[in-house]
Amino acid sequence: MSRPPAPTHHQSIDRRRSSVEPVALSDIGEFDHACDVLVVGFGCAGAAAAFEAARAGADVLVLERASGPGGSSAQSGGELYLGGGTEVQKACGFDDDPDNMYAYLEAALGPNADTEKIRLYCDGSVEHFAWFRECGVEFNHSLHDSPTWMPMSEDGLMWLGENSWPYNTLARPVPRGHRPAARGFGGGVLMERLSAAATGAGAGTHVDTQATNLVLDETGRVAGLVARRYGKRVTYRARTAVVLTTGGFVDNEEMLAHHAPVLLGHGKVSDGLDDGSGIRMATATGAATRRMSVVEIALTALPAMVCRGMLVDGLGRRFVNEDVYPGHYSVHAVRHQPGPYWTIIDEEGYESVAEADRWGVLPKYVTETLAELEESLGMPPGALETTVETYNRHAEKGEDPYFHKDAKWLRPLKSPFAAIDPAAGFFGGGAGQGTGAAGFTLGGLHTSVDGEVLNHSGDPVPGLYAAGRAASGMHGEGYVSGTSLGDGTFFGRRAGRAAARGKGSE
């Protein structure tokens, strides 16, 4: 079934200001529908929760506000951050273990990361990989061995910064980006498999159904919810639990302004429906949130070009080792450097990238001298010349003492020079509302490792669980591709099992 169009700005304001206050059970009367576990949102976290709850024997119903499953997960690249010794890693000749995986993720996910969740995720990663295989997700046993946002090949394994400084000094470099067998974006294939697995396990679905309010009984336990379906009010009784997997809040400008203003004015990585509805419904019951300022930011600077040249800020200065995971250089740029940002490359570097791997990226300016390029870019005279001269002097010796880019990407840049504008986007499509950046939110409801939504005292809100981007997962101030789909499904599964039994860990 086709997805309805993304909401207009006016519609998002109306939706944002609608009441999310909980409804008393005594005010409902007879419910229109009833089940044991009610899952709200049919992206990857919702599919995982529904699958596990149904497999545990619960009567499960999934509500999805769009016309079919998928959500923002289906529009993603489909990368899954998995490791610890999966069959794909072994087939590609890499030895990994949970402790090594943990050492990388603890650093890469940044300050204030949830180390308890990271530890569980790493220890359970091989089993989680097996679960994807059980759900019908296939992975090719081949490695994409160069920096990229997403391989256009069907390779099943990719590097996600593990082999770049400083992370290669903290953990043994092992690639952990697992990709479903698909050319290009694999999120759609991933969601086809996961949604089919959930319904195959026995979960029912109601699409075109938007949850609006949670229902509380006289003790304060979540007992169901109120929704709108085809313009009519519909009520749902959840005998055991409600699981919120409704996504983040990047499509809610008011919430962004309050919690994560760094994303204001940039593009949105979403299906247009990540408006924080689940977070708002839960907080209206007294639920707490965590890390609401944490975001993912993607700069449309092509890694294949960046690593062969340099990434500079608006003053012509390098600020990062360009072979690092591109999400890291994106955050460095947008959060900490004066824009605009430019990829500086020479003719040899540009031509060395296969045309199929250029993603339609073309230089905005090409000049014979750096002085001419500085003038075109509006940089201070001599700034870029100084940067390139310093870079070239050390690159001749295979060194990068300031930023530690790997020697295999180091060589002196020579005329003619080119500047590539990230704001032009890939395939000429523009990017980030003209800023060259787009992102999504990572903060959300405060949850236990079993998905129990916690209140401000740290106690569970009875009958309420959450996972995916509606919850605050493993992330601190950092992000790595595959950790959103990865922790959404991993902790979605835990939430589904806990919801089915009506409690958290014993």
What are these regions (language model features)?
Residues 55-76:
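Glycine-rich FAD pyrophosphate-binding loop
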Residues 37-62:
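N-terminal Rossmann-like FAD-binding beta1-loop-alpha1 element of flavoenzymes
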Residues 13-15, 120-233, 253-254, 395-420:
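Conserved redox-cofactor binding core of oxidoreductases
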Residues 185, 229-299, 485, 491-494:
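Glycine-rich loop(s) and the adjacent beta-strand/alpha-helix scaffold that form part
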Residues 1-37, 55, 474, 478, ...:
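Extreme N-terminal leader/targeting segments of oxidoreductases
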